[in-house]
Design a protein with these regions (language model features):
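Active-site-adjacent loop and "lid" segments of alpha/beta metabolic enzymes
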Residues: 3, 11, 28-42, 61-79, ...
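Catalytic-pocket segment enriched in acidic/His residues
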Residues: 24
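Catalytic domains of carbohydrate-active enzymes, especially glycoside hydrolases
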Residues: 41-57, 244
């Protein structure tokens, strides 16, 4: 798969995506990296530790998050993207579901859009932007309720809907990654199930990204707070690797 100018053999060589939240209120690390110097130092540390992609996020998407304006989100992420591009030779993913933010991010140098609403957010213009910019896109499963008739099959069907949106806009298959959306539109049992059956996403024909890092499902299972979820993160990441996932989005 090509992400910007970078080529990855994801089928044979899975990679780590390092999380860089430049937000004051992310569930796990809000406020830690929301200035340029701290963000660059953390980026350097993650690359040293093996991250092959840096995922920049300017708005928390934790449960109960506060929606911010496009302008505020752009003001958070664009300077960071520009500085990372100046200082490091690494592809940048932008974690946003807003087309205006994504456009500004791509213009600043982002190589990939990580869309937690799977191209289904209200403006419905994200797919057109991805098609025109040729950026890679991670299509995540999400919904605003936890009602399913046949859970795993429903997740696959809803991801197919997102993929259809991408195709209709002219997005190429070579640009697409899919994500089961652990922690999004799912209750505790459903999160456990989608991790268990994450290999089913391979049926869609795209690389699979798995993001379980520090998620509440780990905290509930092990009865630990967000600062003590490393063991659960490692365990679920290993499960994902064994089930064919190609990209692992992690804090550590």
């Amino acid at each position: 798969m090509k992400i910007g100018k970078y080529n990855f053999d994801l089928e044979n060589d899975p990679i780590i995506m390092g999380i860089l939240n430049v937000t004051p209120d992310s569930f796990s690390d809000g406020g830690k990296w929301d200035n340029i110097d701290a963000a660059l130092k953390h980026t350097e540390d993650m690359i040293r530790d093996g991250a092959k992609i840096i995922d920049v996020g300017g708005e928390s998407t934790r449960p109960g998050y506060t929606l911010i304006s496009d302008e505020e989100e752009i003001s958070r992420v664009v300077p960071v993207i520009e500085k990372i591009k100046e200082n490091f030779d690494v592809p940048i993913s932008l974690d946003t579901y807003k087309t205006n933010v994504a456009r500004a991010g791509v213009e600043a140098g982002a190589d990939m859009i990580n869309d937690v609403w799977g191209l289904k957010w209200k403006d419905r213009d994200m797919a057109d932007l991805v098609a025109k910019s040729k950026a890679a896109v991670c299509i995540m499963h999400n919904k605003d309720n936890i009602s399913y008739s046949n859970y795993v099959e429903d997740v696959l069907a809803e991801l197919k809907e997102s993929i259809d949106i991408a195709h209709k806009a002219g997005v190429n298959d070579s640009q697409i990654v899919v994500d089961p959306g652990v922690g999004f539109g799912k209750d505790y049992e459903q999160n456990l199930l989608i991790i268990k059956y994450v290999d089913r996403l391979k049926e869609l024909g795209y690389p699979v990204l798995l993001g379980t890092s520090r998620k509440s499902v780990i905290g509930l299972t092990l009865d630990v707070d967000k600062d003590n979820r490393m063991a659960g993160t490692v365990a679920t990441t290993v499960m994902g690797y064994e089930r064919g996932c190609s990209i692992f989005r992690v804090h550590d």
